[in-house]
Every structure is written in structure tokens, then in C-alpha cells.
């Protein structure tokens, strides 16, 4: 579990730093696209794998919108490693027992903060969002 926490801390440093430094550059069009991706994250009628892939797509697009290719690549790499951890927690569990959308409940607040051009608030909500990963068990 320590390695998972370290990866989440790494993601927070990368994603939070990108949002803090470049979040105000994200356009309304990009936020609209992120909202569409988030709709997929909020579905409870999908498999855990489908849910994870939607969440991964949201975070990758969020960081891509910040416009730093190196951070973008590092987040993708880290998300790849976290896919294995997520699989251990969720895959094979009956989707009727899960409320997968709960671990994406902060996405809307992140996007709202970005619309307000409030990068600090977006980072605060990102921290809460990443914290939900460790609550999966």
C-alpha cells in the first residue's frame, strides 16, 4: 500500500503543479470536453475496468489541457501503474455492489474551479479526488 500512496503523492505533485501553474490557460472548450469525459466517470452501470478507463481518460485529458507534454507523459505512466492497484481492489467484484461514481465525485468541483479560473481551488479538489483512491477497499 505504501507504493500506491507514493504514486498518488507523485500524481498530486504533477497534476497539482500543472493545474496551479497552467490551470488558468485551460479553455472553456477544453472544460466542456472534460465535462463530457466526466459523464462517463459518473456511470454506475459499467464494469470496474470501464470505469477506471473513463477516470484515466479524464485525468489524462485534464493534464493534457495544461499543455506540458513531459508532465502529460509522466501522469500517463503513473496511471498505468495505478491500473494494477485498481484492478486488485475492484476487478472481479460484482458491479451491483459498487458505486464506482463515488470515487469521481470531486471532478465536477475541479471543473467548476477551472471555469472560475481558481487554480488553487482546483488543486484542493484534486487532492480530495486522489484521496478517494485509497478508500477503495
For each feature predicted by the language model, list its residue ranges:
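HTH-adjacent hinge/linker in prokaryotic transcriptional regulators
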Residues: 1-9
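Amphipathic alpha-helical packing segments from all-alpha helical-bundle domains
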Residues: 49-53, 73, 98-101
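Surface-exposed charged/polar residues within alpha-helices that form helix-capping/stabilizing sites
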Residues: 6, 20, 43, 64, ...
Amino acid at each position: 500500500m505504501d507504493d500506491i500512496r507514493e504514486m498518488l503523492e507523485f500524481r498530486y505533485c504533477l497534476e497539482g503543479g500543472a493545474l496551479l501553474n497552467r490551470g488558468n490557460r485551460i479553455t472553456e472548450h477544453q472544460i466542456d470536453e472534460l465535462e463530457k469525459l466526466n459523464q462517463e466517470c459518473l456511470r454506475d452501470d459499467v464494469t470496474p475496468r470501464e470505469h477506471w478507463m473513463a477516470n484515466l481518460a479524464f485525468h489524462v485529458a485534464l493534464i493534457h489541457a495544461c499543455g506540458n507534454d513531459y508532465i502529460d507523459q509522466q501522469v500517463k505512466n503513473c496511471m498505468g501503474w495505478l491500473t494494477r492497484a485498481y484492478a486488485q481492489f475492484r476487478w472481479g467484484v460484482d458491479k451491483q455492489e459498487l458505486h464506482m461514481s463515488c470515487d469521481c465525485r470531486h471532478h465536477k468541483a475541479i471543473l467548476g474551479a477551472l471555469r472560475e479560473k481558481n487554480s488553487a481551488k482546483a488543486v484542493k479538489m484534486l487532492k480530495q479526488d486522489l484521496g478517494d483512491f485509497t478508500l477503495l477497499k
